[in-house]
Regions:
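A short hydrophobic beta-strand segment most commonly corresponding to one strand
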Residues: 156-168
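Conserved metal-binding segment of the jelly-roll/cupin
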Residues: 136-149, 153-155
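Short, conserved beta-strand element in jelly-roll/cupin
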Residues: 93-108, 112-114, 120-122
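A short, N-terminal "cap"/entry segment at the start of jelly-roll beta-barrel domains
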Residues: 20-91, 126
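An anionic, turn-rich surface loop/hairpin at beta-sheet edges
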Residues: 115-138
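Bacterial N-terminal signal peptides
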Residues: 6-15
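Positively charged n-region of N-terminal signal peptides that target proteins for export
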Residues: 1-5
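His/acidic/aromatic-lined binding-pocket segments of jelly-roll/cupin-type domains
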Residues: 90, 96-100, 133-134, 141-142
Protein backbone atom coordinates (compact mmCIF):
# COMPACT_ATOMS: atom_id res chain seq x y z
CA UNK A 1 0.00 0.00 0.00
CA UNK A 2 2.87 2.39 0.85
CA UNK A 3 4.39 1.74 -2.59
CA UNK A 4 1.08 2.52 -4.32
CA UNK A 5 0.70 5.78 -2.39
CA UNK A 6 4.27 6.84 -3.13
CA UNK A 7 3.91 5.87 -6.79
CA UNK A 8 0.67 7.82 -7.12
CA UNK A 9 2.20 10.86 -5.43
CA UNK A 10 5.25 10.78 -7.69
CA UNK A 11 3.07 10.33 -10.78
CA UNK A 12 1.01 13.39 -9.88
CA UNK A 13 4.14 15.41 -9.11
CA UNK A 14 5.67 14.45 -12.45
CA UNK A 15 2.47 14.97 -14.45
CA UNK A 16 1.94 18.44 -13.01
CA UNK A 17 5.56 19.50 -13.41
CA UNK A 18 5.86 18.15 -16.94
CA UNK A 19 2.71 19.91 -18.09
CA UNK A 20 3.48 23.24 -16.44
CA UNK A 21 5.92 25.47 -18.26
CA UNK A 22 5.13 28.71 -16.48
CA UNK A 23 6.49 30.07 -13.24
CA UNK A 24 9.81 29.33 -11.64
CA UNK A 25 10.87 26.31 -9.65
CA UNK A 26 10.55 26.79 -5.92
CA UNK A 27 14.19 25.81 -5.60
CA UNK A 28 15.83 22.86 -3.97
CA UNK A 29 14.12 21.95 -0.70
CA UNK A 30 16.44 19.02 0.02
CA UNK A 31 16.94 20.03 3.64
CA UNK A 32 13.37 21.07 4.39
CA UNK A 33 11.05 18.09 4.75
CA UNK A 34 8.15 20.39 5.64
CA UNK A 35 7.96 21.91 2.13
CA UNK A 36 6.89 20.49 -1.20
CA UNK A 37 9.46 20.04 -3.95
CA UNK A 38 8.81 20.83 -7.62
CA UNK A 39 11.00 19.33 -10.32
CA UNK A 40 9.83 21.18 -13.43
CA UNK A 41 10.41 20.14 -17.02
CA UNK A 42 12.87 23.04 -17.26
CA UNK A 43 14.71 21.76 -14.16
CA UNK A 44 14.97 18.28 -15.68
CA UNK A 45 16.36 19.73 -18.93
CA UNK A 46 18.89 21.85 -17.02
CA UNK A 47 20.06 18.91 -14.91
CA UNK A 48 20.28 16.69 -18.00
CA UNK A 49 22.40 19.29 -19.80
CA UNK A 50 24.90 19.19 -16.92
CA UNK A 51 25.35 15.39 -17.04
CA UNK A 52 28.66 14.16 -18.45
CA UNK A 53 27.86 12.69 -21.90
CA UNK A 54 30.95 10.45 -21.74
CA UNK A 55 29.69 8.58 -18.64
CA UNK A 56 27.46 5.53 -19.27
CA UNK A 57 25.55 6.03 -16.01
CA UNK A 58 25.50 9.78 -15.35
CA UNK A 59 23.17 11.09 -12.66
CA UNK A 60 22.57 13.90 -10.26
CA UNK A 61 20.52 13.78 -7.07
CA UNK A 62 17.97 16.58 -7.02
CA UNK A 63 16.16 15.71 -3.79
CA UNK A 64 17.14 13.57 -0.84
CA UNK A 65 15.25 13.28 2.42
CA UNK A 66 16.64 11.57 5.51
CA UNK A 67 14.89 9.01 7.71
CA UNK A 68 17.13 7.82 10.55
CA UNK A 69 14.72 4.94 11.22
CA UNK A 70 15.19 3.37 7.75
CA UNK A 71 17.89 0.78 7.08
CA UNK A 72 19.68 3.15 4.68
CA UNK A 73 19.11 6.37 6.60
CA UNK A 74 17.04 7.73 3.70
CA UNK A 75 13.32 8.33 3.34
CA UNK A 76 13.60 8.74 -0.45
CA UNK A 77 15.78 10.14 -3.21
CA UNK A 78 14.94 11.75 -6.55
CA UNK A 79 17.56 11.85 -9.32
CA UNK A 80 17.93 12.68 -13.01
CA UNK A 81 19.81 9.88 -14.83
CA UNK A 82 21.14 9.51 -18.36
CA UNK A 83 21.85 5.92 -19.42
CA UNK A 84 24.00 4.94 -22.40
CA UNK A 85 25.80 1.65 -23.12
CA UNK A 86 27.25 -0.32 -21.49
CA UNK A 87 25.03 -0.90 -18.45
CA UNK A 88 25.37 -3.53 -15.74
CA UNK A 89 22.49 -5.38 -14.17
CA UNK A 90 21.54 -4.25 -10.67
CA UNK A 91 19.41 -5.55 -7.82
CA UNK A 92 18.68 -3.72 -4.56
CA UNK A 93 17.68 -5.76 -1.51
CA UNK A 94 16.27 -2.80 0.43
CA UNK A 95 15.26 -0.25 -2.22
CA UNK A 96 12.36 -0.01 -4.64
CA UNK A 97 12.52 2.38 -7.62
CA UNK A 98 10.09 4.21 -9.85
CA UNK A 99 11.55 5.21 -13.21
CA UNK A 100 9.87 7.94 -15.28
CA UNK A 101 11.22 7.95 -18.84
CA UNK A 102 11.51 11.63 -19.80
CA UNK A 103 13.68 11.33 -22.92
CA UNK A 104 14.86 8.83 -25.50
CA UNK A 105 13.67 5.28 -25.94
CA UNK A 106 15.01 1.78 -25.49
CA UNK A 107 14.46 -1.35 -23.46
CA UNK A 108 14.76 -2.22 -19.79
CA UNK A 109 15.06 -5.86 -18.79
CA UNK A 110 13.70 -6.87 -15.37
CA UNK A 111 13.06 -10.05 -13.41
CA UNK A 112 15.09 -13.18 -14.19
CA UNK A 113 18.45 -13.58 -12.46
CA UNK A 114 21.76 -11.76 -12.65
CA UNK A 115 24.70 -13.71 -14.09
CA UNK A 116 28.32 -12.72 -14.61
CA UNK A 117 29.67 -12.09 -18.10
CA UNK A 118 33.01 -13.89 -18.33
CA UNK A 119 35.56 -13.32 -21.10
CA UNK A 120 38.96 -15.03 -21.09
CA UNK A 121 38.37 -16.16 -17.51
CA UNK A 122 37.66 -12.62 -16.26
CA UNK A 123 34.32 -11.25 -15.08
CA UNK A 124 33.72 -8.20 -17.27
CA UNK A 125 30.13 -7.40 -16.39
CA UNK A 126 26.72 -8.64 -15.33
CA UNK A 127 23.55 -9.27 -17.29
CA UNK A 128 20.06 -10.59 -16.69
CA UNK A 129 19.22 -14.11 -17.79
CA UNK A 130 15.58 -15.12 -18.35
CA UNK A 131 14.15 -11.65 -17.75
CA UNK A 132 11.25 -9.63 -19.15
CA UNK A 133 12.06 -6.97 -21.77
CA UNK A 134 10.06 -3.74 -21.45
CA UNK A 135 10.16 -1.40 -24.47
CA UNK A 136 10.06 2.15 -23.12
CA UNK A 137 9.91 5.69 -24.43
CA UNK A 138 9.18 9.19 -23.15
CA UNK A 139 6.14 9.21 -20.88
CA UNK A 140 6.47 5.62 -19.65
CA UNK A 141 6.83 4.67 -15.98
CA UNK A 142 8.39 1.49 -14.61
CA UNK A 143 8.07 0.34 -10.98
CA UNK A 144 10.93 -1.89 -9.83
CA UNK A 145 10.23 -3.51 -6.43
CA UNK A 146 13.10 -4.18 -4.07
CA UNK A 147 14.96 -7.39 -4.91
CA UNK A 148 14.03 -7.33 -8.62
CA UNK A 149 16.95 -7.44 -11.10
CA UNK A 150 16.92 -4.60 -13.65
CA UNK A 151 19.13 -3.41 -16.49
CA UNK A 152 18.85 -0.92 -19.33
CA UNK A 153 19.57 -3.12 -22.35
CA UNK A 154 18.73 -1.01 -25.42
CA UNK A 155 19.18 2.70 -26.15
CA UNK A 156 17.98 5.01 -28.92
CA UNK A 157 20.23 6.96 -28.51
CA UNK A 158 20.07 7.10 -24.70
CA UNK A 159 17.49 7.06 -21.94
CA UNK A 160 16.83 10.07 -19.74
CA UNK A 161 15.13 8.92 -16.55
CA UNK A 162 13.82 10.62 -13.44
CA UNK A 163 14.43 7.99 -10.77
CA UNK A 164 12.53 7.93 -7.48
CA UNK A 165 14.32 5.64 -5.00
CA UNK A 166 12.38 4.37 -2.00
CA UNK A 167 14.47 2.60 0.65
CA UNK A 168 12.52 -0.10 2.48
Amino acid sequence: MRMIAITATFFLLFAVSASSQQGESAGNTTDDSTRAFLLSAADIAAHAAELDASVAYANTTVLERADPASTTGLAYRLAVDRRTPPQRAAQHAAEAELWAIVGGSGAITTDGRIVNIVEDGQTVGRRIEGGTVHRVSKGDFLVIPEGVPHQVTEFDPSLLIVTFEIPR
